[in-house]
Amino acid sequence: MGSLLLTLIYICFISLGLPDSLLGSMWPVLHTEISVPVSFAGTISMLTCVGTIISSLFSDKLLHRFGAGKVTAVSVAMTAVAMFGFSISSQVWMFWLWAIPYGLGAGGVDAILNNYVALHYKAQHMSWLHCMWGVGAATGPYILGFVLTWGGTWSHGYGAIAILQVVLTAVLLMSLPLWKKRITITDESGQEVTA
């Protein structure tokens, strides 16, 4: 069960990275469509960061109250809602609005899963965890390119990422029992430890 859950955690970090590079990929076209200067991309990123900081600061309380599985599922759901919101946005204020739940969700996934892996798995898995974020960040523009190749627009690209996030949310909800099971790991000295 530990390796199944670890695989799911890796997939969560891939999904965390997927939308992170979309704004930069779409902004050269998007900023002209919504009639704002190029520099406004920074305001969207700033609001996303504010949400990330807030959720990171409250992650400990949320973790102890609801558990890692539930907080992760809700956080991924928030990013899915935000991606859908981005996909229907036609004004910059709408992007500002949806940047908040995006940041809250992304910060929740990041803080909770980093903590969970640090406590329940060997140190090498932390490196792989962040590698998975890189896979997601590199894959996001490819998904956008695929959507554009088939006649879609930037909004369809965000919609595609939203659908992937919704599917992951459903998988996370179904996997909640895995998060409650105690797993056995091997520590640095070779001893098996129940975590």
Question: Which residues does each PLM region occupy?
Answer:
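Extracytoplasmic
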Residues: 4-30, 34-36
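Short hydrophobic/alpha-helical segments at membrane-entry points of transmembrane helices
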Residues: 8-9, 91-99
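Residue-level signature of mid-helix packing/kink "hotspots" within the transmembrane helices
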Residues: 21, 48-57, 138
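Conserved MFS/SLC helix-loop-helix module at the cytosolic interface between two early adjacent transmembrane helices
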Residues: 53-93
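MFS-fold secondary transporters
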Residues: 82-86, 102, 172
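Helix-loop-helix hairpin linking two adjacent transmembrane segments in secondary transporters
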Residues: 92-94, 128-181
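Cytoplasmic helix-loop-helix junction between adjacent transmembrane helices
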Residues: 98-132
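Flexible cytoplasmic inter-helical loops of multi-pass small-molecule transporters
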Residues: 173-195
